[in-house]
């Protein structure tokens, strides 16, 4: 009997020990250490893309950090936690970064707000790659352009013939120069030109609006602007043969 009790005692101690270990290793459901990723913001609003401040970065990240915390505690609000942004995963302070030349990696750590217990613990240093800032071209202004295209009949110019307005060399050159003055890294492949021309009589100059729009996939620019143009069609030479 003593042997049996001894065996049971041994198993009892072992069971208690195992339970204790499990309890120590269990992560509470509201522990911020559960957060491993933070979504990247579409852009970072800044006064100077070459010197994006810590405060501007935090503003850009606020909504996505909140979503990450709410993945731990659904009812959490921005008042329940605080976060900061660092240069690396060692907590080196960050003052400014340059987002004009390319993407930049920063590290975010989230901790509970003072005297708040909705969330506990803290995250590690979570890497977030901030996207290169696209220059907004919506403020670009270009002088009125004179555009001359060829048509089979200048009095009955078709929509297809009017597409030549979009690639007219002088217009395209003026647009590119104006954009590069604001966004030096931009090129002709970053934007597209369209017009509001209706088919009809262009034997005399006609006022039209040309739209210059940054392509969605452009890594350098965003936005669009309008250009006033006077379009005239002249008779196209007859096709050979």
UniProtKB/Swiss-Prot annotation:
Transmembrane segments: none
Keyword entries, A-Z: Cell membrane, Lipoprotein, Membrane, Palmitate, Signal
InterPro entries attached to this UniProt entry: Lipoprotein_mollicutes-type_CS, Spiralin
Lipidation (S-diacylglycerol cysteine): 24
Bilayer topology term: Lipid-anchor
Entry superkingdom: Bacteria
Nucleotide-binding as UniProt keyword: no
PROSITE patterns (UniProt xref): PROKAR_LIPOPROTEIN
Localization annotation: Cell membrane
Residues carrying lipid (N-palmitoyl cysteine): 24
Modification after translation (UniProt): Palmitate and stearate are the major lipid components.
Keyword Transmembrane helix: no
Signal peptide: 1-23
GO terms for cellular component: plasma membrane
A Pfam family matched in the record: Spiralin
Subunit structure: Seems to occur as dimer, tetramers, and large oligomers of identical chains.
UniProt function note: Major membrane protein of spiroplasma.
Assigned protein family: Belongs to the spiralin family.
Name listed for the protein in its UniProt record: Spiralin
Lineage of the species this protein comes from: Bacteria, Bacillati, Mycoplasmatota, Mollicutes, Entomoplasmatales
